[in-house]
Amino acid sequence: MKLLIAIDGSPASQKAVKYAARLFKSLSGDTHISVMTVQDDSSLRLFKKYTPKGSVEDYLRENADKNLAWAIKYLNKTKLAHDMIIKYGNPSEQIIKESKSGSFNMIIMGTKGRSSWTDTLIGSVAQRVVSNSKIPVVLI
């Protein structure tokens, strides 16, 4: 079974990683976890024109590394097979695209991200992933 965990560094995404680890520990057979973070670079494109070459990319990479650091540390302790994926662009589109190209069986993600303007009950990224995914999506 291949599992894709979409994270953004929020408390909800940390809960998603913990849930996935508990779920996979209870399963037998071949299991693999891929933890993915997507850096939404749409609002930073304008800055690329006015900043030194590579500075926006460096910022996005640092942010991605911060998002993944906790998950790496946590999953290393579990001894579960895992890898990390960093993508750039629209988060929901990249999550759906990766779920298809990676032949995943399930997506696990938090219901709300880090944005302060998220929807009341469920975040906009989670809504779009649930609406467009061809595989089961578990929201934590």
Protein language model annotation of sequence segments:
Residues K2-K53:
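Small/aliphatic-rich secondary-structure junction motif
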Residues D8, G89, T111-R114:
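Histidine-centered beta-alpha loop that forms part of the nucleotide-sugar donor binding/catalytic region
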Residues K53-K66:
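A short acidic, glycine-rich active-site loop
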Residues K97-I140:
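Gly/Ser-rich helix-loop-strand patches that form or flank binding pockets
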Residues M1-K2, I140:
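Absolute protein N-terminus
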Residues S34-M36, D83-K87, V138:
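General small-molecule cofactor/ligand-binding pocket signal
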Residues K73-I107:
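Structural beta-alpha unit
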Residues A21, A69-N76:
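Class I S-adenosyl-L-methionine
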